[in-house]
Amino acid sequence: MKANAERIEKNTVLLEIEVDAEQLSQAMERAYRKLVKSVSVPGFRRGKTPRPIFERYVGKSALYEEAMDYLVPVAYFKAVEDTGIEPIEKPKVEVVQVEEGKPVLFKATVQVKPEVKLGQYKELELTRPSTEVSGEDVEKELVRLQNRYAKLVTLEEGTVEKGDTAIIDFAGRIDGEPIKGGEGRDYSLEIGSGSFVQGFEEQLVGMAAGETREIDVTFPENYKAEELAGKEAKFTVTVKEIKRKEIAPLDDDFAKDVSEFDTLEELRNDLSNKLKQAAENRAEYQVKMDAVTKAVDNAEVEIPEVMITNQLADMIGTLASRLSSQGLSLEDYLKYTGSTLEDMRASMMPEAERNVKTALVLEAIARAEGIKASDEEVDEEIKKMAAHYQQDPEVVRKMLEKEGQLKFIAEGLVREKTVKFLVENARILEDTNGQANE
């Protein structure tokens, strides 16, 4: 087989492919063996019709069509591999010659990944955020623990305050008519949580247990239930019980109750270490993202529209899958958010374009620096995946190969190594109290 690639436009390549006559002959025989099993010819059992008679019955063109349906994709993908082009869409194929005893000639026109003009990606100046943890940070974390483990205690007297949990009965009306689904009994509502329509919870502040009050609210214009959007409603609310958090004092007993430590000091030290580790992780992530951002900003590339369109479709598909796992369809989500698919595409477009450019630039840097993923690194990644899913590594490998996902493992590793390369070759300043120092 022979293949020649010619760039006819900036991101368009013309492949001229020649497949030898012997391969066509084999493809024709394969086509005959496949078709003869599905076509009944008078006087012969299905699958037993001699080829010359079968060809006369169905027409030789049927065999040519079946043979080319098999031969063209095989030859095309081999040509792509041999020429090293990177297609971004399906090719437009034009058959030039197909005749038994002669080579098959066809052309394939296809858009390919654009060329990237790299800018500066070494010696990037980056600032690592401060990872200092103050005593105040630790105390805030202790307060969060106090609130998390606080007990709700029923008030014998007093009124509702922000942060309290009120047990309420409520019934809503619009123009005197009950709201469908707008009533509840013994509903537990944390005041200030934003669980109800804006203005509802605020109007419960100051109510005592046993008190009933009429409150007025207006549903937002983009409210998920369209029949209520923008309408004014009146709710009758009865507070049946008020519960308030009982905060445990910060002492050794508290430490024992909420952790594996015996003293408050040990708990403080542990929280400090965890906050420090979290801060270091955030700083490392920020440095990586800043390195990628600068390298991408410094590069130039004209992105074909089809790449952005495909990326957009992937992003929407990922969102739809995530919503589906939560029992919600994309259509319902759009309805609840008061937007359309066109609105969603428009809002996602800049991110899609940025994602494509980032991928192209990182690929270009990897090529320029000879960054690759070794077989051993791929094997190690598969072992990690297998351990996570409690599967045999070989079973995971075969599954990835079957689904054509193995190359994405290698691509992910190359991307990680490329980002690491950017950071290792950057000039990193340390941010200490808002001042960047080397």
From Swiss-Prot:
PROSITE patterns assigned: FKBP_PPIASE
Domain of life: Bacteria
Alphabetized GO MF terms: peptidyl-prolyl cis-trans isomerase activity; protein folding chaperone; ribosome binding
Listed GO CC annotations: cytoplasm
Any Pfam family hit: FKBP_C
PPIase FKBP-type domain segment(s): 163-248
Catalytic activity, reaction form: [protein]-peptidylproline (omega=180) = [protein]-peptidylproline (omega=0)
EC number: 5.2.1.8
Keywords for this protein: Cell cycle, Cell division, Chaperone, Cytoplasm, Isomerase, Rotamase
HAMAP family attached to this UniProt entry: Trigger_factor_Tig (MF_00303)
Protein name: Trigger factor
Name of the coding gene: tig
